[in-house]
Amino acid sequence: MRQAIAEEVSRSRGVKVTSDEVVVVPGGKPIIFFAILALAEVGDEVIYPNPGFPIYESMIQYAGARAMPIRLQEEKDFRFDVDEMASLISDRTRLIILNSPQNPTGGVLSKQDFHDIAAAIGDRNIMVLSDEIYSRLVFEGEHYSIMSVPGFQERTILLDGFSKTYAMTGWRMGYGVMRSDLAAHITRLMTNSNSCTASFTQVAGIEAIRGDQSSVDRMRAEFRRRRDAFVAGLNRIKGFSCRMPKGAFYVFPNITKTGWKSKPLADALLEEAGVAALSGASFGEFGEGYLRFSVANSLENLNQALGRIDAWTKKNL
C-alpha cells in the first residue's frame, strides 16, 4: 500500500517519494491529529485557514497550542492574503495548515499562491501540513501542491486519501507523506493509538490507486455539472449570492442580504423547507454570513432543494 501511494504521489506531485515516507491511517483525521501532536505543544502557534475544516482548530487547542486563523476572503475566491499570513508568523509558529481545494468554500490556491507562501515562510523552522484530500476534484486548471515547490518537500506533511477521490468514505483510509524521520514518529503514534489500518481495506486501496481512473474523471465531471446548476440556481434566489467554487463538492453562498445569521437560517431551512445546509459559523468565526451546501446528491434532488429554498425565501424574506 505504501509503495503504491509513493508511486502515485511521485507521479502527481513531481517529486521522488519512497515507501518509508508514507504513513497509512484510518481516514485523514489521524494525520491532522498526529502532525499537530508531533510538532506543537503548549505555547506554540499553528496558523490555519478560517473558515475551514473544524478539526484543525479543535486539534490545535487539544494540543495546548494557540490557534491562529487566517481569513479566507470571498473577494479573492476564498483564497487568503499571503501578506496577512506572513504577519501572523512569529518565533512561536511551528506549523501552517493549508487546504486546497478547500472545505467548506471550494476555494483553490494557485501555483503562484504556493510559491508566495513558501517565500513568506523562508528559512524559518516551520512545517506545512497540506490537506489535499480533494486533490482530484479541481474543476478549473490543475491541482498544485506546496510539496512541489523546490525546497519544500522535506518541510511538507501531505495529507490525502480515498474518501473523496474514490467515494470510499466508509472504508476509512487516508495517508500522510512526509520525510522519513518524521514518518517514523507519526507511525509510532499510529501504532500506539489505532494499531493499523485494516488490511482488507488496504487491498482495496491498492486496487483503487493502481486501477482504471476513468470513474474519477466521470465523477469530477458530474460534480462540475451539479455545481454549475446549483450555483446558478442559488444566485436567482432572493438574499443569496454565490461565487463559483473551483474545487471539492461544496458551494458556500453569502446569505448576509437575507438578514439572517447563518445558524438560524440553516435550522429554518432544515425544519421548514426540508433542505440540509451547514452554518458557515460551524467552520470558524469568518464563516458567519455563509451556508455550506453539498452537491454530493443527484441533480434532481439538488433542483428540488433549490425550489424549496426559493419558496421558503419568498414566504419569509
PLM region descriptions:
Residues 1, 5, 28-31:
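Generic hydrophobic, aliphatic-rich segments that mediate packing or membrane embedding
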Residues 4-7, 11-12:
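Glycine-rich loop-to-alpha-helix module at the N-terminal edge of alpha/beta enzyme cores
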Residues 11-317:
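PLP-dependent class I/II
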